[in-house]
UniProtKB/Swiss-Prot annotation:
The lineage of its organism: Bacteria, Bacillati, Bacillota, Clostridia, Eubacteriales. It catalyses: (R)-pantoate + beta-alanine + ATP = (R)-pantothenate + AMP + diphosphate + H(+). NCBIfam families: cyt_tran_rel, panC. The active site is at residue 37. This is Pantothenate synthetase. It comes from Clostridium botulinum (strain Kyoto / Type A2). GO terms for molecular function: ATP binding; pantoate-beta-alanine ligase activity. The gene is panC. One of its GO terms (biological process) is pantothenate biosynthetic process. It is found in: Cytoplasm.
Amino acid sequence: MNIVNTIKDVRLIIKKWKDENLSIGYVPTMGYLHEGHASLIKKAREENDKVIVSIFVNPIQFGPKEDYSTYPRDLVKDSSLCEKFGVDLIFNPETSEMYPNKIYSHINVDILTENLCGEKRPGHFQGVCTVLTKFFNILNPTKAYFGEKDAQQLAVVRKMVEDLNFPIEIIGCPIIREDDGLAKSSRNAYLNKQERKSALILNKSLKEALNALESEEKNSNNIKDIIVSKLNKEPLAKIDYVSIVDSITLQSVEKIQSPILVAIAVYIGKTRLIDNFTFKL
C-alpha cells in the first residue's frame, strides 16, 4: 500500500493504472476511520481493480465555530485499517497541497442544499462539492463510495456528478451502526461515557417514527412530533433539526405520498450527531 502526499505523485500512479485499463474505486474520507468507512472500502474492493482512500480534513467545509481544529486525526490507525481491507493507495495531502493559493472557484448545488445540514451549516456543501470536484479531477476514479448516514451529501454529490458530466458512478452504502444502534461516526470519539449513553436517543426516536409510518401515519408533522417528543426526554439532547423531506428533491413534505427521508441532527452535549432513514411507501 502506498501513502502519497502530492498531486504530482498520485497522478503518476493513476496514469499507470489507467494505461493498464484498471478500474479505480475511490473512498473520500476525513480520516479517523471506523467500521462505516471499512464498509465503503470493502464495497470498493469488491467492485474495482484498485482502491484509493483520501484522508483530508477539508477546512473549507467547516464553519468558523465548528470543529476543524479539534477534528480527530490518527494516520497510523487509519493506515492500519486501510491495509487490512486491501486499499492500494492512501492520498493524504497537506492543506497547502490542495489549496496552495486563495481559492476563488467554488462549486454550489442549489435546491438540494436548502434544508437539513445545508440550512444549518451555511457554506458546508459548497466546501464539500469544491473539494470533491478537485479530488475527482485529480484521481479520475471509476466509482466513488459514500455512506448513507450523510444522506444529503450523497444526494448532492449525485446531482453534481450528473450536472457536471463527471464520468464517475456514485455508490451509496448503508449506515453501519454500533450493536446498540448508534450510527458509526468519527465524532462519536468526542462523547464521554454519559453522552455516549444519551446518544442512543437518536436511533430510538427514529425507530418510533418508523413504527408510526409502518402503521400508516401519513402526516409528516405528526411524525416530527413523535421524534421531537422522544428527543426532548433526553436531558443532554438539544435538537438542531428534525426534517421529513422527499428522498429525491430533499424538499419538505407535509403529506407523505412518495419515498421520504427522515433526518435529524442533535447535539449531545457539545457534539453534533446526525442520523436518518429512508421510508418507501
